[in-house]
Amino acid sequence: MKKTSNRLHSLFAALAALILAAALAVPAFAVEGGFADLYYRMNDSAGVLTEDEDNELEDALEELSLRQSFDVTIATVESLESVDYDSMEAYADDLYDFCQFGYGSEMDGVLLLVSVGDRKWHISTCGYGITAFTDAGIQYLGEQMTPFMADGDYAGAFRTFVQWSDTYIDAARAGHPYDVNNLPREPLSLMLSLIHI
């Protein structure tokens, strides 16, 4: 009887260890094979969007991220002081890491952070995002978004970010990331080149 009790105890211990190991491994596999999906991709803490705009952008970010296997996220804060940070870059990087944004083992993705009260923005990249979003490309993207933000049209700025992010990822995957010598053509310069033909 004692042998059966010991075997049963050993079996339960082994089963408990197996269940614990499986439970701990599931989150690691989930991140390794895709997205952690712990937080919304549209985080409007500053409250600059209407509910409809927030939902529209969340859907657009979700669709883009899944289609590209690349996490595209946006966050707003009232000010750096409100989150107890001095640096946009430090807060954006910490937020990206804390929320476990990114796709796969390299955590491929991009985060646009906007501090409304400070009138500042920062783009944080990780994994393949570093290739897809070069410094020159980020500067160009900022030039496309800031007129909307200056007018208080944050939804317009964020729609622009989503659309250009899709283009940036495609360009990088085609082997031509937007950079100093390969920035998108301005519509006016394209028209002028057609006129000269």
Language model: regions and residue ranges:
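Bacterial N-terminal signal peptides that target proteins for export
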Residues: 3-15
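Bacterial N-terminal signal peptides
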Residues: 14-25
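Conserved small/polar residues in nucleotide/adenosyl-binding loops
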Residues: 195-197
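Folded, non-transmembrane soluble domains that reside on the lumenal/extracytoplasmic side of membranes
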Residues: 29-191
